[in-house]
Amino acid sequence: MHCPFCRHPDSRVIDSRETDEGQAIRRRRSCPECGRRFTTVETAVLAVVKRSGVTEPFSREKVISGVRRACQGRQVDDDALNLLAQQVEDSVRAAGSPEIPSHDVGLAILGPLRELDEVAYLRFASVYRSFSSADDFAREIEALRAHRNLSAHS
């Protein structure tokens, strides 16, 4: 790794620690040329494969913006959205694959969103699952009620 101060092409790792709940490694480094120290953070790249076949890096911000639209006018704060995005990222990373279909990202959003806000869940699910009629909404509402009843009894 190049030193950010003198651009020397090598550095020595002094210390390594896991960070971000094991999703990244923080390394403290020293430059043998100028002697200055610096920190690097390494994360494994998680790629999302779109329907078109194009891949792009996973983005928590993209998850948040999509869910924020579904939550418009609802009492959902930024902390809750950030937590949901973290849960989604943890879920897709737990699959263990460096690439994940965008469909699976949508699935990973549905569960935490259902727990966060049922109206936002219905809005998101209607777009994600391409609802085309009131019957689609009615079926989803029934499934939501059944899930709520199961959760209440367990």
Swiss-Prot record:
Residues 46-136 form the ATP-cone domain. One of its GO terms (molecular function) is ATP binding. Its cofactor is Zn(2+). Signal peptide: none annotated. GO terms for biological process: negative regulation of DNA-templated transcription. GO terms for cellular component: cytosol. Disulfide bonds: none annotated. Keywords: ATP-binding, DNA-binding, Metal-binding, Nucleotide-binding, Repressor, Transcription, Transcription regulation, Zinc, Zinc-finger. A zinc finger (unnamed) spans 3-34. Pfam families: ATP-cone, Zn_ribbon_NrdR. Binds 1 zinc ion. PANTHER family: TRANSCRIPTIONAL REPRESSOR NRDR. Negatively regulates transcription of bacterial ribonucleotide reductase nrd genes and operons by binding to NrdR-boxes. Belongs to the NrdR family. Co-immunoprecipitates with DarG in the presence and absence of darT. This is Transcriptional repressor NrdR. It comes from Mycobacterium tuberculosis (strain ATCC 25618 / H37Rv).
